From Swiss-Prot:
This is DNA-directed RNA polymerase subunit beta. GO terms for cellular component: DNA-directed RNA polymerase complex. It comes from Ralstonia pickettii (strain 12J). The keyword Nuclease does not apply. One of its GO terms (molecular function) is DNA binding. Keywords: DNA-directed RNA polymerase, Nucleotidyltransferase, Transcription, Transferase.
Amino acid sequence: MAYSFTEKKRIRKSFAKRATVHQVPFLLATQIQSYAQFLQENAPVAQRKSEGLQAAFNAIFPIVSHNGLARMEFVSYHLSNPPFDVKECQQRGLTFHSALRAKVRLIINDRENPTKVKEIKEQEVYMGEIPLMTSTGSFVINGTERVIVSQLHRSPGVFFEHDKGKTHSSGKLLFSARIIPYRGSWLDFEFDPKDILYFRVDRRRKMPVTILLKSIGLTPEQILAHFFVFDNFTLKTEGALMEFVPERLRGEVARFDISDKNGKVVVEKDKRINAKHIRDLDSAGTKLISVPEDYLLGRVLAKNIVDPDTGEVLANANDELTEGVLEKLRDAGVKEIQTLYTNDLDQGPYMSATLRTDDTADQTAARIAIYRMMRPGEPPTEDAVEALFQRLFYSEDSYDLSRVGRMKVNSRLNRSSGTGPMVLTDEDILDTIKLLVNLRNGKGEVDDIDHLGNRRVRCVGELAENQFRAGLSRVERAVKERLGQAETENLMPHDLINSKPISSAIREFFGSSQLSQFMDQTNPLSEVTHKRRISALGPGGLTRERAGFEVRDVHPTHYGRVCPIETPEGPNIGLINSLALYAQLNDYGFLETPYRKVENGKLTDQVDYLSAIEEGKYVVAQANATLDKDGNLIDELVSAREGSERETRMVTPDRVQYIDVAPSQIVSAAASLVPFLEHDDANRALMGANMQRQAVPCLRADKPLVGTGVERTVAVDSGTAVQATRGGVVDYVDANRVVIRVNDAEAVAGEVGVDIYNLIKYTRSNQNTNINQRPMVKVGDVVARGDVIADGASTDMGELALGQNMLVAFMPWNGYNFEDSILISERVVAEDRYTSIHIEELSVVARDTKLGPEEITRDISNLAEAQLARLDESGITYIGAEVEAGDVMVGKVTPKGETQLTPEEKLLRAIFGEKASDVKDTSLRVPSGMSGTVIDVQVFTREGVVRDKRAQSIIDEELKRYRLDLNDQLRIVEGDAFQRLERLLVGKIANGGPKKLAKGTALTKEYLADLDKWHWFDIRPAEDEVALQLEAVKVAIEQKRHDFDLAFEEKRKKLTQGDELPPGVIKMVKVYLAVKRRLQPGDKMAGRHGNKGVVSKITPIEDMPYMADGTPADIVLNPLGVPSRMNVGQILETHLGWAARGLGERIGNMLKAQAKAAEIRKLLGQIYNESGKVEDLDSLSDAEILELAENLKKGVPFATPVFDGAHEDEIRRMLDLAYPEDIAKEKGLTASKQQVTLFDGRTGEAFERPVTLGVMHMLKLHHLVDDKMHARSTGPYSLVTQQPLGGKAQFGGQRFGEMEVWALEAYGASYVLQEMLTVKSDDVNGRTKVYENIVKGEHSIDAGMPESFNVLVKEIRSLGIDIDLERN
């Protein structure tokens, strides 16, 4: 197997038992593909599919005027290039967007002859701005990165359910059906406790369902014919003959003697009819049974009965037979009658009973009844009734089932075709009611609405399309009204279309929708996870309060689609989920997961993606089934999931149809990063997966020694690590950029074969963590496409590295690790292992005020020179200045109005005659509790305002850097082009050239070297092909120079034009502070198994427990944190990490002893190839083996994939390999090598029993004590209650709550209590008085009336109760 450039530098030893057939798909594919389908930016106009923007335009256009003479058609749309790139948008606080322009055609017909076209106008119209997605799947909105989270909602279609017996006290199951469209009115059908079937539209008042059936044109006779089978009777003068249908009699009690045609009694009266009786009647050839008169009474007629002579209706369908009716029928000579067959078991009389409750006469009456229900109080005119009825379910404008909805309706109603009209049809309604009646009759099953076949995912593209469509339909209404005037006023399309509604709909969605979220950017994993999140909340979804247990629970269909582990704790549990590692969406928006095909018990390499619905048809085995080397299932019974319930059963191998592609396919990206996940309790695994997203990137990333093999995938797919887009040779590297000369094979002919990667340096993330990329390649390195060439935040050699590998001992230590506290060695702090850089952005704006403009200046009165020392002449701090809380960073003065002077000021004025300054100091100062180094300053100036020197110098600097970039590019491009030319020309025959080159001379390197490079183009090669290529290169270089000049001009224009600032703002300055945070007591740390704790003490190295060879532990954890929490994974990780560290030490010792490459190769072979996945070490050269060994000195990285990880014996093998007997003895290891005799650092005595010691990957989480530490003396108060505000952001106080008051009461500390509830809180006069007293040197309190008492009095008065405080 071939290793990539970075992979062979440090190979991760994998314990996976199964080779992967199917690679993990690109992690951000759902987001990026969805939005690409929405925009269809690069698709040719003619080939655009009807989805996204195209579908929205097609749905709204053509727009026809009210009189029908003018209409506007849509031709095509295109998106312009974005005016600023992503980085510029982030700096300037703009949205990264593109202008949408649509070409529309206005067609006006002739008034006299409406079929004749009078004129056609075609024009391109601006339709608003559409935000573009960045390459990593996020959006930049007003300068901040946001993510649109996908939504899991109920799929359109038809659903059948029952109330589980909760509605009615008897516990009777009430069945209901609901037809949910993608857009339009919901149609519900439901039984009530009396078994009458009702329908309702949009949850309005319910009406008998027969009204709906009549309104679609069915008569009562037809309704009964659809829902019942009939009994046929022939009337006799006394009694009647009934047509004998055997099945209908079984189980009934005979109400009279039943005889066969020969008159022999087969069933006696009051006996139950069984199968034998029916067989006897059948074998006797019975066709008719004679029944007495009372058998007919109470039966219901199926059809209207008309007098054959007079045409008079004798009885209506659905009438009950009485003696009177029978007499009437006999008198009229009616012989044949049909009645409804019903029984209590599986043929209930529901529709017949419903018809009786319905008093509408015909179709018109039924439609009027529906109109009255929808529009109560409006007069039902014929047109209005008809229009409303059509619009409810039959009009494409207001009703849309969508492709998914139609497919789901057809499959649920058992139709063969998956396609059909996008509106409801009469058949749909009728079939749904039939199916519901069958359910009530006990045939069929209700739907499970939590099944992932009934829930689909709406991605960014679809959500944006819905918003765009909403905006476009508002435009449509305006256009319709103005189209009438188009002809008379000679208007053009752009006069008719106003793009505001579209822009505002899109802006509102991206800016403030519940699904548009501020991107979690703490580390690369949090970005990836946020983009793969699936939320059931949001518009059209559930709400936290109403979501029950079932919706939140793990469902069998989540397998391989949604992660059962990763979900937030708290009110959102189960409503916000994460996409499983291999899952993807199908065309309909349902989640699919890949399975390997199995044929006759043998695995094939075919991988199929199955949705939850399709999977229900197959038997699917688990990935850990035992295989032989040819891929045959060898166990007698294999555990597999089958049936719609996906129950796990044991089946024989020949029945297996599919098998999982990988053991990790059931979990999400975050959960698959937890090694030994299979040994952790699910609750702790959940915490572990969630806490990895809060890990702060450390100064130096350190790859986990024990990983799972997914680290590289996450790091690369997140976009943090830079990948080479094309292979080539590294030409130039510095901290800011990597330049690669592309391989000839990958370069397109005639283009410049140079890729320049500008790296991100010290940039602030959304969570104020630091994003910084470092190059990993040297000049001359050969890289292939997809290789990692630079590391980003929290990545180490292209692998995700969220924390640091620590030597951990599990033992109590003087109570400092009580209750999950963590004891840390000073060495960890001294080596800056957990030091992180946080970047704070502080900004100040100078506005235009009523009293005049604010000014950013260095000239501030009454500020000491020491305070101004950091400011330059423009009043802005220098880069590199180290600032503390309270220091001025940008000087700013605001004009203030004439104020009342104090007597002192009056005196000064009288003496010095100067006018005291009329400006107040409103400078930007460093907030309390913050200190750091200024690393960047940006100045934005409004158009038309003169720039200060600082702003100008920033622009010059930026242009200089850009010019340098371009010159570099040009140098490489030209150098590269001339190298290619040299390879092309040397040895070719020329017809002439500079320096009097003779015709027919072969070109040599020496001749070319003598020429000035630009004169090479004057050579006239003999071969036409070569001449053409020479000319092409010349044109390409000139074009490139021209392009570069244009690009530079464009950049200069962008930088020198004024900035777009909010109204009233003249100038804005942003200062970026880098704050270094070392680990300190109070910081939260965690492992990857949900083992979290707070640092309690940083202990001197000499006091830490140490091993026999003197190595002290880095961290001491409490062993009591393991058993009750059942996350044993951390212990296994510690053992395997210990082996990894030991193997690294062995390799390091060999390198120190300058061992031969062959020896090292042998040891590496033992490590890598004796169990688990085999590595191809033979393909590496000796130099590469030595470089690999050098990188393994600190520990051999292991991968133990989720559910397919290292077994106990493998960990033992690795420990034995790492610590041969001599080393084990020296370190004081026990026989198992998993525990060590440790010594107390303070006394030097050995602890009385061995201690588990090893290496664990520990994270520092984003809950830092520096961000939480806060104190207040005086500060802001709440307006109404006058009590201090709460929280650090508001500079609030600590709440002295109910329980604290009880504590003081219990101690009887009455004066303390009085002070707490009055002068320290909301006694306004008392507060000021205390201040006065302290100033005067008196330490006394005058407690008065708390303001909240007045609030209470006012509240009571507002209830209309007069209350007064009487003082006596």
